[in-house]
Amino acid sequence: MDTLTAIGRWLAKQHVVTWCVHHEGELWCANAFYLFDAQNVALYLLTDDKTRHAQMSGACASVAGTVNGQPKTVARIRGVQFKGEIRRLEGQESDAARKAYLRRFPVARVLPAPVWEIRLDEIKFTDNTLGFGKKLHWLRDSRAQQA
C-alpha cells in the first residue's frame, strides 16, 4: 500500500479536524467535522462566514492543522499534521461537496453554513501501530516518502 493510500484510509475513518489560520499577525484555531476526499486530497467542512476563523481566512488562506484519535495507549497513537490552503467553495463545486458531506453527516442539513475545502499540500502521519515514532510523509508536488 502506498503512503497516500495508508494516510487516506485513516483520515476517512476520522471525523474531526483542527486547523489554524494566520491573518495580520493573529492566529486562531477551529474544530469541525470533516469529510475526506481521497481523489483531491482535501477535507470538506461547514463553517459560518461570521466565525472568526472564516473572517480571517477570507476567500482563501494558508492553514496548518491536525487530525488525531484518542487512544489510551502510546502504542496505538495515530495522527496527522498538515499544511495546506483553505478556501470557500462556490457554485457547482460547493453543491457537489455539500451533497457528499451530507451523506456522511445528515444532521448538518439544518446548517446553512457554506462549504469550505482544506487542500492538503503536506501531510505527516504518525502511526505507532507500525512501530514507535513511525512517520509517513506525503507532499502534493512530489513523490510520497517514508521516514
Curated annotation (Swiss-Prot):
Disulfide bonds: none annotated. Gene3D superfamilies: Electron Transport, Fmn-binding Protein, Chain A. This is UPF0306 protein YhbP. It comes from the Bacteria. The gene is yhbP. Belongs to the UPF0306 family. The lineage of its organism: Bacteria, Pseudomonadati, Pseudomonadota, Gammaproteobacteria, Enterobacterales. It comes from Salmonella paratyphi A (strain ATCC 9150 / SARB42).
